[in-house]
């Protein structure tokens, strides 16, 4: 089947007007597809930059996302060991943590772009966090606001299944 028949008369007329060979048509089609993919990828990166909690351009206020899992505590990272993933920059406390993150970034990224999980679940708002107040559940990192006598991790624990479900829904709405 020729490209003209596969894509319809409008496309066929464009190819015919341009007097392209079959190989040129294939190259033209592939370049168009690649351009579309690059535009989509850039949009996704821009969306992450817009919605992730990156004060001073750094995620989790510079804390090492891998250390939450390996040391079960918040450990300050360093610009010496930094990497960017889809437009978001992370700091690490060691070269090995940086390498571990690069192997599986989605495994270590905090949920809800690093915003307070409780606030995202309660009303879909982006509230800053205390990197030292966290919970790992189901292999995922959740961060919480903890200032001025308010520790939202305690509130989250009281109704975690409902808040978690609602936070997932609210976070998805930000990306559509």
Protein language model regions, located:
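Short coil/turn motifs at helix boundaries and re-entrant loops, enriched in small/polar
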Residues: 15, 94, 146
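Mature extracytoplasmic domains of secretory-pathway proteins
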Residues: 91-93, 97-109
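Short, surface-exposed beta-strand/loop "edge" segments at domain boundaries and coil↔beta transitions
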Residues: 11, 98-99, 149-152
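Bacterial Sec-dependent N-terminal signal peptides
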Residues: 1-44
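Intrinsically disordered, low-complexity terminal tails and linkers in eukaryotic proteins, enriched
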Residues: 42-86, 108-176
């Amino acid at each position: 089947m020729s490209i003209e028949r596969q894509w319809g008369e409008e496309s066929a007329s464009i190819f015919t007007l341009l007097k392209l060979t079959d190989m040129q048509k294939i190259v033209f089609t592939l370049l168009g597809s690649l351009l579309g993919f690059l535009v989509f990828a850039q949009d996704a990166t821009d969306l992450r930059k817009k919605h992730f909690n990156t004060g001073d351009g750094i995620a989790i206020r510079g804390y090492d996302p891998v250390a939450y899992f390996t040391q079960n505590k918040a450990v300050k990272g360093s610009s010496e060991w930094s990497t960017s993933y889809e437009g978001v920059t992370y700091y690490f406390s060691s070269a090995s943590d940086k390498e571990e993150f690069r192997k599986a970034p989605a495994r270590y990224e905090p949920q809800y772009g690093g915003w307070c999980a409780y606030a995202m679940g309660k009303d879909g708002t982006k509230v800053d966090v205390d990197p030292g107040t966290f919970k790992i559940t189901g292999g995922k990192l959740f961060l919480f606001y903890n200032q001025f006598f308010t520790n939202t991790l305690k509130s989250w624990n009281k109704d975690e299944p409902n808040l978690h479900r609602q936070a997932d829904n609210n976070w998805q709405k930000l990306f559509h």
